[in-house]
Amino acid sequence: MRIWLAPDHARLVFDLSGPAAHKVFTLDNPDRIVLDVENSTLKADLERLGLDKSPVERIRSGKNGKTLRLVLDLKHGVRPKSFDLKPNQKYGHRLVLDLYEKESLGKATKTAEPQAIAGRDIVIAIDAGHGGDDPGAIGSGRVREKDVVLAMAKELKRRLDQTPGYKGQLTRTGDYYISLRGRTTAARKHNADLFVSIHADAFKDPRARGASVWVLSSRGASSEMGRWLASKENSADLIGGVGSVSLDDKDNVLASVLLDMSMTASREDSRSIAKGIHTNIKRFARMHKSHVEQAGFVVLKSPDIPSILVETGFISNPGEAANLKTRSYQKKMADAIYKGIVQHFERKPPALTLIAQRKAKDNRSYKVVRGDTLSVIASKNGVSLASLRKVNSLKNDTIKVGQVLRIPAS
């Protein structure tokens, strides 16, 4: 029996020796949750669970015939959600009980108000793969993917937050699990301009090695477009990242065109950013392939947000696992991703962002007219004479009528 704490819920995981039917219900005054598990007995030590920061005060157990009853005495009311998990490579049958804070459910699907203010930050959603009961791949020396990628994600956020005009948003800040769709939902909630998912690869052959960068395949894009158009819930959502275009009031043809345009633009930006990151990583690390790869990963399927996935190396390879767990290598990888992101957005910033404003100022020009002098032009445009000379590669102050000068940012 284990417990994981996330910002909006606590997850209790019960390891089972086999499948078992169960039911959950709540009681009031005081707040309690009752979990009945048929044909079961309890072997876990409830006193050692570590409930201090959870909404659970204590857990009591009892038997009703062959049914095991667990009563969770709560510190405050929560909303339970339970489900079964089938065995995987690490765990056997499991029963999962998620306890959601009541106020978080109402907020979970709400998208933040679009940042329409000129000069806003470019928002990067940074997704550290796996977490909680899902450790991801486990490499030599028990290096866990979920730990390595969270460290890289935090370093990437630190770099972005230190750069004027950029803001990093982590999909998870600690060791807890978020569903695949929940990760992209979190990106949309923060009006992200880009979604970056960070992972570490694994393969049965420990000789496999190399980092890779992935974007959504065309097959994955077409299937996701159909899913969005077929879903009333999705069609009422936003497209266009921080825009506010809704599909729910459009006929099918127009909705299809709008969504296709959004996905095309998103995939073009994804490829551009992915190529830059691929180039940066291969300067210090071996790449699994010499090009950006494509697949239908669920986390890449946002129709309105450019999305990429970075496999930072094979954690199943002892040499790469040793690198991935070091702070210096994690910083190198985060720096390569950071540079690829910034390189793209400096070339193609979203509208109304601080970077777009700065680029517009950098692109100002002035056409010389009769009577102009270089010093007068500098004064008119609020820039120094030295900077005006430098940006135009002028060796002296001689200019000609009709000559077009670049005006540097003031």
Where are these regions (language model features)?
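Signal-peptide-cleaved, periplasmic/extracellular N-terminal interaction regions immediately downstream
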Residues: 1-124, 376-379
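Extracytoplasmic
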Residues: 7-11, 17-20, 28-32, 54-56, ...
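Active-site-adjacent mobile loop/cap segments within catalytic or ligand-binding domains
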Residues: 22, 255-354, 389-390
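Short connector loops/turns at beta-strand edges and beta->alpha or beta->beta junctions
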Residues: 40, 129-133, 165, 313-317, ...
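Catalytic-core regions of hydrolytic enzymes
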Residues: 105-254, 263-275, 331, 369, ...
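Primarily a LysM-type cell-wall glycan-binding module
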Residues: 358-385, 403-404
